[in-house]
A protein has these predicted regions:
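Beta-strand-dominated extracellular/periplasmic modules and repeats
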Residues: 1-128, 133-155
Length: 155
C-alpha cells in the first residue's frame, strides 16, 4: 500500500542542512568544474526555498537555492554509464510539489546525439537538458513550467 504524497512547503527551507554539501570535487582539483544555475517558476521568478540534488552513481551533492533561486556545485565530469554519455541525474525539491522531480544534466562538449534518452526527445526537450558554457562555468537553469520548461522524467 502506498502512502499518499503531500506538498513540501511552505516551510521547506527550514529543514535544510546548513553544512555545505555542494562539492563533488575540491575546487583545487584541476578537473573541477563550477556548475551554476537557477530554479525558476513559470514566470521566470527564482524559487527561493528549493533544493537541488545531483547524482552520479554513488556520488551525490546537494545545494539549497538562495533568495534569487540560485544554486551551485563544484563537480568533476562523471564517468558515462554503458551506452550513454556523461551526465548527472538532477532531483528538484520545492514547495508545492507532491513529489520531487527528476531531470538530467548533460555536458555541452560530449557527443550527446549518441545518448538514447536524449535521442528520444524533441529538439526543445534536448535543449533543456544540456548545460551551457558561460564565463568559465557551466550554467544549468531549471524551469519548472512555462514556455522554457525543463524536460522532467517519470520515476
Amino acid at each position: 500500500m502506498r502512502t499518499p504524497s503531500q506538498t513540501v512547503g511552505p516551510y521547506f527551507a527550514i529543514g535544510l542542512s546548513r553544512r555545505d554539501e555542494s562539492a563533488l570535487a575540491p575546487r583545487t582539483d584541476p578537473a573541477a568544474l563550477t556548475l551554476v544555475g537557477r530554479l525558476l517558476d513559470g514566470q521566470g521568478v527564482g524559487i527561493s526555498d528549493g533544493m537541488i540534488e545531483i547524482w552520479d552513481g554513488a556520488r551525490w551533492a546537494r545545494s539549497g537555492t538562495d533568495s534569487e533561486g540560485r544554486f551551485g556545485f563544484t563537480v568533476t565530469k562523471p564517468e558515462p554509464a554503458p551506452g550513454s554519455v556523461p551526465r548527472f541525474d538532477v532531483w528538484v525539491f520545492a514547495r508545492g510539489l507532491l513529489r520531487h522531480q527528476l531531470t538530467r544534466l548533460y555536458f555541452p562538449d560530449e557527443p550527446n546525439e549518441t545518448d538514447p534518452v536524449l535521442a528520444a526527445l524533441d529538439d526543445e526537450g534536448r535543449r533543456t537538458l544540456v548545460a551551457a558554457a558561460e564565463d568559465g562555468a557551466l550554467r544549468f537553469d531549471i524551469h519548472m513550467q512555462g514556455d522554457r520548461a525543463t524536460a522532467f522524467f517519470e520515476h
